[in-house]
């Protein structure tokens, strides 16, 4: 097969591992920066170009689209889809998962466990918003944040009011969530592929830090999932419409709660913690599913 990997970073661990795994299985791989692509959209023969040349035909595309380029990256991916190329994760699923509030709304409708979440627009609603999520301590999140950036733990009501008011004053979109104290600064990353969790790791925050992201100094270790955790992770990925997802959950007193569904999960932490060939499993999944793609894709725009 000829496989395109949409990535701005050919030197990144995840990209290199996918290239390596695909080449080991005899495939031709091209790493393409989506920001360098431009599109010809017409009723006869749509195409994608880079540097004055039309890209060749691909059998499959693996999107590794960063959060900062979601809009343009999704547009490029959608163009591949409209040209009949199999997308490991499609543009609709990626767009859903990148909108944190929409993700929460979709999962709540499916009855998936979540932290109590509040969203408001007016400063006059702040007191009731805080009460809705159970009061302080609580977590305040920028909807556009990634890797723990833009996430604040407000330990007192006064601090919560001040931070929320400041974000609102900056016209920043935020959501407010209950603080799951019993998680003790740890979360679980479930790596979902198709209808299975193929790997999982526990991420523990540094002392004095509540964010467990590995980019913020958290440590990763093996973890054994309960059947309920495995099931809820798969349901969360399916709700987003993703074939590949990093589903982050916390162990709360009332069962697992989903914090986020990541459509472009990193491979370094999960492969390091579990010693599993996650990249190889992804390429194998593409091989099995690429023949099922229809000439007219299911992308809804």
Swiss-Prot record:
Residue numbers binding Mn(2+) 2: 260, 262
Keywords: ATP-binding, Ligase, Magnesium, Manganese, Metal-binding, Nucleotide-binding, Protein biosynthesis
Cofactor field: Mg(2+); Mn(2+)
The ATP-grasp domain, residue ranges: 104-287
GO cellular component: cytoplasm
Binding-site residues for Mg(2+) 1, renumbered to this chain: 248, 260
Domain of life: Bacteria
GO biological process, one term: translation
Cysteine disulfide partners in this protein: none
Binding positions for Mn(2+) 1 per the UniProt entry: 248, 260
Molecular-function GO term, any one: metal ion binding
Binding site for Mg(2+) 2: 260, 262
Binding-site residues, ATP: 141, 178-179, 187, 211-213
Listed EC numbers: 6.3.2.-
Cofactor note: Binds 2 magnesium or manganese ions per subunit.
Similarity remark: Belongs to the RimK family.
Descriptive protein name: Probable alpha-L-glutamate ligase 2
Organism: Shewanella sp. (strain W3-18-1)
């Amino acid at each position: 097969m000829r496989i395109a990997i949409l990535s701005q970073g050919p030197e990144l661990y995840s990209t290199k591992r996918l290239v390596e795994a695909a080449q080991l299985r005899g495939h031709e791989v091209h790493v393409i920066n989506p920001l360098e692509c431009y599109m010809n959209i017409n009723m006869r023969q749509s195409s994608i170009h880079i540097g004055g040349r039309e890209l060749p035909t691909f059998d499959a595309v693996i999107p590794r689209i960063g959060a900062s380029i979601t809009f343009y990256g999704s547009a490029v991916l959608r163009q591949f889809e409209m040209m009949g190329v199999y997308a490991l994760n499609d543009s609709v699923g990626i767009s859903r998962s990148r909108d944190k509030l929409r993700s929460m709304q979709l999962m709540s409708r499916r009855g998936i466990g979540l932290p109590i979440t509040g969203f408001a627009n007016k400063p006059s609603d702040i007191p009731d918003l805080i009460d809705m999520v159970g009061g302080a301590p609580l977590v305040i999140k920028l909807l556009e944040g990634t890797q723990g950036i833009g996430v604040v733990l407000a330990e007192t009501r006064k601090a919560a009011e001040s931070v929320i008011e400041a974000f609102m004053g900056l016209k920043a979109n935020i959501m407010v969530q209950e603080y799951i104290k019993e998680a003790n600064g740890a979360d679980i990353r479930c790596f979902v592929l198709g209808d299975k969790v193929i790997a999982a790791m526990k991420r523990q925050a540094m002392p004095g830090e509540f964010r467990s992201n590995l980019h913020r100094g958290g440590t990763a270790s093996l973890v054994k999932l309960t059947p309920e955790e495995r099931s809820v992770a798969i349901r969360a990925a399916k709700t987003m419409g993703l074939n590949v997802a990093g589903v982050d959950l916390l162990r709360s007193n009332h069962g697992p709660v989903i914090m986020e569904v990541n459509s472009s999960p990193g491979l370094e932490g999960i492969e390091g913690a579990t010693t599993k060939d996650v990249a190889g499993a992804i390429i194998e999944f593409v091989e099995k599913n690429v023949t099922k793609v229809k000439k007219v894709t299911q992308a809804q725009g």
